[in-house]
Amino acid sequence: MERGAAPGGGKVPVFRLRGITKRFGGVTAVEGVDFELLPGEVHALVGENGAGKSTLMKIVGGLYAPDEGSLEVGGEPAAFSSPRESEAAGIAMIPQELDLFPELSVAENLYVGRRRPRTRWGGIDWGRMRREAGEKLASLGVGLDVSAPVKRLSTANQQLVAIARALLREARAVVMDEPTAALTGREAERLFGIIAGLRRRGVGVVYISHRLEEIFRIADRITVLRDGHLVKTAPASALDPDELVRLMVGRPLSEFFSRHPHEPGEVVLEVRGLGREGEFADVDLVLRRGEVVGLAGLIGAGRTELAQTIFGIRTPDRGEVRVFGEVLPPGSPREAMERGVFYVPEERKSQGLIAPFSVKDNITLSVLERFTRFGFVSRGPERELAGRLAGALSVRGGGIFDPVSRLSGGNQQKVVLAKSLAREPAVLLLDEPTRGIDVGAKSEIYRLIDRLAGEGRAVLLISSELEEILSMSDRVVVMREGRISGEFGREEATQERIMAAATGVRGPSAAVAEEEAGR
């Protein structure tokens, strides 16, 4: 079946929600929403963070009960009081944070919550269990050691285990929440192939993602939620990216990228002959005041490693970094911050934030000594700084005393950026700053980058999204296999030129490598 074709062939929906309303205290999360999933279709569910997507699917998954409205499964009325009841009805949930048991084997994870095969003497038939697990994975075109602990697998392979578990339970519907957020280009391609296989089997897939290019590639229908309300359900073929963004956030895609190029000023940061064995070599790079330099390249090109070496997380084998003309001592993030350089990591949850800490504590952590005298912290000035930066970056989802773990991905990223701005940096190294966040939050971060450049700060923007690189950069530097392979001014930079420099392939064939653009 072609993407965008009418799925289901008039069949009864796998499940259908009618007039769903869910309230939490005085807050209405979703109101009067209709949604259905047909056999063998990929139905994309999109909207900004807080639009109600997760709430709606948690009702389907048995985690929440609706306050109003009804649920049908296979044309029959249904009401789930637990996830187990939802699973028994043939609905499998694959959350972004996979619910696997890392210490258990692949085979054991596939049988969690399911009766394990028994020998005639009543013991667990481990041989049969491993064999069936291997067969189910093989049906997905995957060969894994089913005896290995899940913790040893890559994120992509853990995801395949979750999908195989759903199939072992004979799921008729699979709900995937941001399934490619942590995958490389190749891994995402493999996932798309598996989703196509699920469609051929007649399994319905609900696909939740912020990545519009993926949605238009694999979805048959798209449902848009905004502020807890249903905006529209339409065939994917009847929409385009600009229209979809307008439905999601109320303004067109053309208004998303906020870049007002400024005349670059003095050199702020200079990299000379920087190298690190096995990662990158002979890198020369210059950043000027008021300039956004995009750093493009494929997975493994060395971009993240370069940024971390500039900041001091990694130590170079050769070369030097200069800030305002003075050599920056290698291997010292503290010294880098003192000189006005700040790195915002791609992995915000594990490297950029302390999840149990409050928004305030995360923002002020890097400047706490500023408020400390004789071992005591002056809480008033600390609160004032955190509140001012949280307000300036429009951090939403709670107050500055709430745990940062409660915020959406986009708001967590704003907190990481606020922490960097607390240092008043001259140079910002931004590693995938919009990865995994919704389109509205992306727009706000683009405006922030433009504002920072307008204030005279230098920004190094690492991104795997070529549209982001092209729209936000004054210059584009390309890395390939650890070396600088190209540099383009704003007027010279095109998608084709960047991909040619990133792959070493000249001409139109370079475009086929675009899917591999990454860290």
UniProtKB/Swiss-Prot annotation:
Entry membrane topology: Peripheral membrane protein
PROSITE patterns reported for this sequence: ABC_TRANSPORTER_1, ABC_TRANSPORTER_2, RBSA
The keyword 4Fe-4S is assigned to this record: no
A GO molecular-function annotation: ABC-type D-ribose transporter activity
Keywords: ATP-binding, Cell membrane, Membrane, Nucleotide-binding, Repeat, Sugar transport, Translocase, Transport
Top enzyme class: translocase
Keyword ATP-binding carried by entry: yes
Alphabetical list of Pfam families matching this protein: ABC_tran (PF00005)
Every ABC transporter domain range: 15-252, 262-506
UniProt EC number: 7.5.2.7
Catalytic activity: D-ribose(out) + ATP + H2O = D-ribose(in) + ADP + phosphate + H(+)
A GO CC annotation given for this chain: plasma membrane
Residues annotated to bind ATP: 47-54
Primary localisation category: membrane
Cell location: Cell membrane
Transmembrane regions listed in the UniProt entry: none
Organism domain of life: Bacteria
Family indicated by similarity: Belongs to the ABC transporter superfamily. Ribose importer (TC 3.A.1.2.1) family.
Function description: Part of the ABC transporter complex RbsABC involved in ribose import. Responsible for energy coupling to the transport system.
PANTHER family: CARBOHYDRATE TRANSPORT ATP-BINDING PROTEIN MG119-RELATED, D-ALLOSE IMPORT ATP-BINDING PROTEIN ALSA-RELATED
Subunit organization: The complex is composed of an ATP-binding protein (RbsA), two transmembrane proteins (RbsC) and a solute-binding protein (RbsB).
Protein name per its UniProtKB record: Ribose import ATP-binding protein RbsA 2
Upper taxonomic lineage: Bacteria, Bacillati, Actinomycetota, Rubrobacteria, Rubrobacterales
